């Protein structure tokens, strides 16, 4: 054939890799929705009054260019042997876990397991995590992770206040807690009116506090049993919290045996890299009596409709999406993927392996202590697990520099002390290098531990067979595969969750997070060892400011909900600096549950604003309530586009009313995927927003975390952004590390560079096209609840399934039936009860959109049969989802097995089979079981 020149560019990442529909498919979709072009659709959808003036104009990179560029940045980081400690330790991620979990889209692209029937694998792994934490801490109930140790400690303080019968308003913090933990607790306490008293635990006045927290082992390495203080607290009807270390608890007396009510800490050293601060899975466990006050997710054991054991998220009525400002916490995204990794680390090593690691760590620390003592540098504590603190007088800077010259970072403790922490990756050569830095000889290996008999662990742990069955890597690999096969993630199908933006997490974006130059850096390493991170943070912040119209960014918040909290604290600090006392926050009734929960955490009083029938904010009600608040108005919180999936034209007026009365505007960035390149929050009148990097900017959801929620602010708020003990600032920190979960920022950095400014804008347009295409295709079968003035939706649409209730069909029935078609359900019953909110994102092809539409139409046909007289109990909808076991078990249904298991349009060859039938939610909450069930259940599942 003759030579011809093609305009196809295989290196165009935005249009050839990230954006799903081809130009031809887009043309078909545009024709169906009645738009002449993509730009015409956008002009018809996005009000001219909110459009940005200039375009995003940086160039795109190819995948090869991006990897070369990021390699150059990574090379500017200098990972040293970290012996800083302070809650962060070197660890070895078993390659079996790195390859099969961290690098596996079956694990990292899943959503939070609200639909338990298609999340059984992930739920089992998280149940293993809870069992691991409960066993090691000696407390019966644990949650499925929190954001980091410091925020877990702050959550424990609030939980203690809620549970305590003491009338005190003071919380005691042991002065030997990690500095970042103390600072985050102080930040959390101030807006809640809690007094924090930091001091020597030996001087604790239990009658004057509602609770206290002790670090065990302490930040300086010492071991002190707080049992006496805990007993005094209990006599005063106060609550005792112990911040602890899971590896240490394999050899040390557990908090439960000391009488602790709550235990918190980080599971980071169970196989999760340092990552310049995160992400890491924190944990919390508690006494059984406190379980209903526990923040975060709790995985429990229930049964399905055939009586088979099944896992689910339990006690959800505690959470923000239901209780709003009365919730136990604003926690939404946590750290599920990292909790899964930590649980597999425990399964991989088993109790004997974990104890062996702990013994090796401890005895190396003992040898180092003996060497330093022989050279005249006796550690402060005679008993310790892995950390020594040594007085060195005026030799501190010389010794620290000598250690750095040998490739080792030690901890600067005040002016005349040095901290040294030993961990899993510490070798004898590292011990010798530290000795040389101190100018002493390495002593012979001692035989006796430096732990007193009364602090040695006497109880067994990890006795469940799951921690003994998978020691061989072949079995471990198969176990991880079996669990991932039970889940439905983006590697199998579109996940059309409204307000969740489940878009492509490209492999090239994920690759750099496993590079040691990003993964092996301690968050408190010297700045000259993290120049690559500094460059990346500066560049990404600048691009996010360009995208949003803000002037400054804080990368510290670890989730969107934490970004909300940080943004509201920033507003509160601004008002205080002006000498104003403002505490009222206006929030629309349709807002995400984290909004009112975050406002309450920031010390604000929530006033709810009505919505109109079309979903827009009721401006009359808004103005009336703003004026009633007067000089007490601190802020309003709005989402744009609205939570109803439309571009409200009144957004500027809302901002103007708020500013006229002295308030600040918080614009929730949950729906930024409909704005990038088209509209800038900072130009609309908003003062602060959080950005969900795990939505709009491609960090994967990880089955419930990690996330990132950096906040952008206008210049007048910049001085009031979160600070940190390690980096300074006028305000307290909201996270343990200065830059939050820094090691996943390369994902978003890669995304904005691969796409370029024009690619990001095109992605927004295609996301809007996809939502309008689905709305138009399904509006004849399901009512589309809210549209803009031109009849368009933004990047998501709400399907009204409420009328089907008259026929006995619930939104839950539709969601479960979608599983038989191989789909995760859209967002259920939010922002309107009994509806489905659909967000397709720009990454899905027309073929996948059509497959979803076909499934929804098939379900509508089944609903019509019920409306025409078929009893609801005889419909496949009522019994969905159907499992492979349904093909062989006794069948007494009014419909055939084929109708139930192979609905019209569903895959037959590559069909996804839910592993359980519909889960009984009531049974799971009535009989809460949140640790691993008996061995027989695992054997049955394996068969």
Curated annotation (Swiss-Prot):
It is an enzyme of class 1 (oxidoreductase). Pfam families: GcvP2_C (PF21478), GDC-P (PF02347). One of its GO terms (biological process) is glycine decarboxylation via glycine cleavage system. The modification N6-(pyridoxal phosphate)lysine is found at residue 695. Its EC number is 1.4.4.2. GO terms for cellular component: cytosol; glycine cleavage complex. It catalyses: N(6)-[(R)-lipoyl]-L-lysyl-[glycine-cleavage complex H protein] + glycine + H(+) = N(6)-[(R)-S(8)-aminomethyldihydrolipoyl]-L-lysyl-[glycine-cleavage complex H protein] + CO2. The glycine cleavage system is composed of four proteins: P, T, L and H. Belongs to the GcvP family. PANTHER family: GLYCINE DEHYDROGENASE (DECARBOXYLATING), MITOCHONDRIAL, GLYCINE DEHYDROGENASE, DECARBOXYLATING. This is Glycine dehydrogenase (decarboxylating). It comes from Jannaschia sp. (strain CCS1). The gene is gcvP.
């Amino acid at each position: 054939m003759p030579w011809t020149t093609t305009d196809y560019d295989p290196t165009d990442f935005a249009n050839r890799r990230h954006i799903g529909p081809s130009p031809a498919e887009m043309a078909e979709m545009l024709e169906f929705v009645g738009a002449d072009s993509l730009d015409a659709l956008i002009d018809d959808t996005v009000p001219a009054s909110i459009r940005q003036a200039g375009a995003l104009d940086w160039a795109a990179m190819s995948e090869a260019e991006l990897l070369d560029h990021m390699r150059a940045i990574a090379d500017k980081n200098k990972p040293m042997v970290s012996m800083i400690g302070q809650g962060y330790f070197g660890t070895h991620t078993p390659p079996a876990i790195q390859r099969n979990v961290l690098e596996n889209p079956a694990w990292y692209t899943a959503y939070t397991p609200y639909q338990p029937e298609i999340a059984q694998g992930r739920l089992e792994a998280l149940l293993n995590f809870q069992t691991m934490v409960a066993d090691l801490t000696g407390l019966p109930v644990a949650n499925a992770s929190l954001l980091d140790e410091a925020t877990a400690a702050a959550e424990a303080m609030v939980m203690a206040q809620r549970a305590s019968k003491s009338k005190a308003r003071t919380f005691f913090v042991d002065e030997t807690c990690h500095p970042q933990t103390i600072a985050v607790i102080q930040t959390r306490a101030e807006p809640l009116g809690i007094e924090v008293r930091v001091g020597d635990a030996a001087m604790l006045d239990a009658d004057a506090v509602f609770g206290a927290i002790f670090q065990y082992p302490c930040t300086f390495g010492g071991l002190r049993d707080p049992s006496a203080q805990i007993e005094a607290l209990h006599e005063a009807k106060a609550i005792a919290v112990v911040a602890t270390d899971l590896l240490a608890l394999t050899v040390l007396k557990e908090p439960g045996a000391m009488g602790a009510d709550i235990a918190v800490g980080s599971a980071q050293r169970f196989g999760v890299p340092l990552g310049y601060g995160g992400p890491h899975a924190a944990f919390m466990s508690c006494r059984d009596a406190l379980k209903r006050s526990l923040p975060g997710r709790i995985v429990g054991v229930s049964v399905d409709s055939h009586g088979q054991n099944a896992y689910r998220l339990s006690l959800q009525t505690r959470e923000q999406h239901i209780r709003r400002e009365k919730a136990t916490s604003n926690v939404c995204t946590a750290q599920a993927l990292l909790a899964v990794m930590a649980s597999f680390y425990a399964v991989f090593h088993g109790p004997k392996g974990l104890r062996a690691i702990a013994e090796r760590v401890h005895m190396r620390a003992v040898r180092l202590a003996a060497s330093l003592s022989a050279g005249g540098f006796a550690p402060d504590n005679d008993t310790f697990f892995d950390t020594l603190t040594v007085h060195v007088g005026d030799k501190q800077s010389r010794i620290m520099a000598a250690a750095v010259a040998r490739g080792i970072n030690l901890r600067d403790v005040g002016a005349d002390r040095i901290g040294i922490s030993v961990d899993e990756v510490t070798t004898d050569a590292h011990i010798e290098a530290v000795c040389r830095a101190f100018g002493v000889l390495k002593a012979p290996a001692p035989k006796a531990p430096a732990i007193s008999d009364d602090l040695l662990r006497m109880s067994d742990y990890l006795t469940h067979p799951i921690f003994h069955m998978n020691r061989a890597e072949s079995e471990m690999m198969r176990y991880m595969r079996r669990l991932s096969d039970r889940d439905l993630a983006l590697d199998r199908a579109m996940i059309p969750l409204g307000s969740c933006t489940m878009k492509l997490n490209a492999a090239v974006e994920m690759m750099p997070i496993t590079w040691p130059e990003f993964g092996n850096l301690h968050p408190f390493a010297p700045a000259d060892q993290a120049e690559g991170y500094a460059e990346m943070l500066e560049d990404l912040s600048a691009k996010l400011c360009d995208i949003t119209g803000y002037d400054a960014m804080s990368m510290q918040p670890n989730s969107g909900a934490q970004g909300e909290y940080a943004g509201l604290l920033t507003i509160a600090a601004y008002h205080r600096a002006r000498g104003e006392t403002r505490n009222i926050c206006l929030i629309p009734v349709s807002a995400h549950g984290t909004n009112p929960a975050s406002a309450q955490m920031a010390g604000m009083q929530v006033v709810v604003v009505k919505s109109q029938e079309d979903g827009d904010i009721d401006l009359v009600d808004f103005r009336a309530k703003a004026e009633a608040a007067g000089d007490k108005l601190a802020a309003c919180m709005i989402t744009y586009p609205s939570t109803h999936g439309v571009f409200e034209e009144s957004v500027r007026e809302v901002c103007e009313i708020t500013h006229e009365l002295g308030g600040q505007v918080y614009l929730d960035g949950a729906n930024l995927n409909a704005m990038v390149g088209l509209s800038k929050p900072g130009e609309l009148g908003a003062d602060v927003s959080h950005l969900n990097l795990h939505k709009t900017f491609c960090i994967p959801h990880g089955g419930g975390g990690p996330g990132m929620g950096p906040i952008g602010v206008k210049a007048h708020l910049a001085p009031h952004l979160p600070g940190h003990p390690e980096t300074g600032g006028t305000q307290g920190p909201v996270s343990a590390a200065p830059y939050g979960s820094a090691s996943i920022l390369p994902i978003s950095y890669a995304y904005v560079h691969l796409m370029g400014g024009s690619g990001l804008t095109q992605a927004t347009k295609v996301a809007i096209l996809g939502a309008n295409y689905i709305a138009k295709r399904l509006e004849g079968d399901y009512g589309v609840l809210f549209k803009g003035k031109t009849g368009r939706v933004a990047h998501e649409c709400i399907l009204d399934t409420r009328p089907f209730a008259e026929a006995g069909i619930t939104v839950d029935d539709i969601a479960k039936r979608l599983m038989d078609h191989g789909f995760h359900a859209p967002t259920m019953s939010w922002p309107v009860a009994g509806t489905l909110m659909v967000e397709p994102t720009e990454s899905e092809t027309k073929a996948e959109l059509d497959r979803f539409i076909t499934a929804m139409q098939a379900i509508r046909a089944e609903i019509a049969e019920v409306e025409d007289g078929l009893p609801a109990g005889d419909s496949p909808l009522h019994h969905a989802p159907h499992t492979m076991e349904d093909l062989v078990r006794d069948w007494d249904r009014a419909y055939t097995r084929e109708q139930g298991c192979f609905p019209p349009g569903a895959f037959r060859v590559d069909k996804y089979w839910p592993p359980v039938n519909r889960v009984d939610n009531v049974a799971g909450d009535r009989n809460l079981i949140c640790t691993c069930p008996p061995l027989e259940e695992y054997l049955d599942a394996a068969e």
